[in-house]
Amino acid sequence: MSSSALIAPAAKEEVATLFVGFELSKSTWLIGLYAPELGKSISRHKVDGGDTDAALELIAAARRRLERLGKPVRVVSVYEAGYDGIWLHRRLTAAGIENRVIDAASIPVDRRSRRAKTDRLDLELLIRMLLALERGETRICRVVQVPDPAAEDAKRQHRERTVLVAERTAHGNRITGS
């Protein structure tokens, strides 16, 4: 589906909404910005992986363009749960952005044909899913419940122990194998 086929959710009140999608990787982040009030296509921008300041400045610039319309601006963002974890969600919400973290396994895939797997297409799909969620289509994908910092810290100790036990086993196997 082309980006020209995007349909914005019904407006609840006179608020301009900026939809932001993040396609995250270790080296670069692809950020898509879509505002129905400004045009029909998604603008794509690349920033270095982990550079939240550059990402937030990009979002702030788009927000300023929307504010010129004279409406209050709401920013909603989305990214797939995975390598970057939850810290980005906390950083975005601290900046006043409504963020959703999507379970990557719940993203619908067309099984009838092989689809190209590119960051650009994935970003488009993420923004389309965000638009659907905003329209109230809750069954389109699963939104991850973000744990509070205390719950996340409780998991960290167990994960570190698992890694250390695996390392110890590997060292023992290497010693007995020689």
Tell where the protein language model's regions lie, with residue ranges.
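Phosphate- and other anionic-substrate recognition elements at nucleic-acid/protein interfaces
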Residues: M1-S178
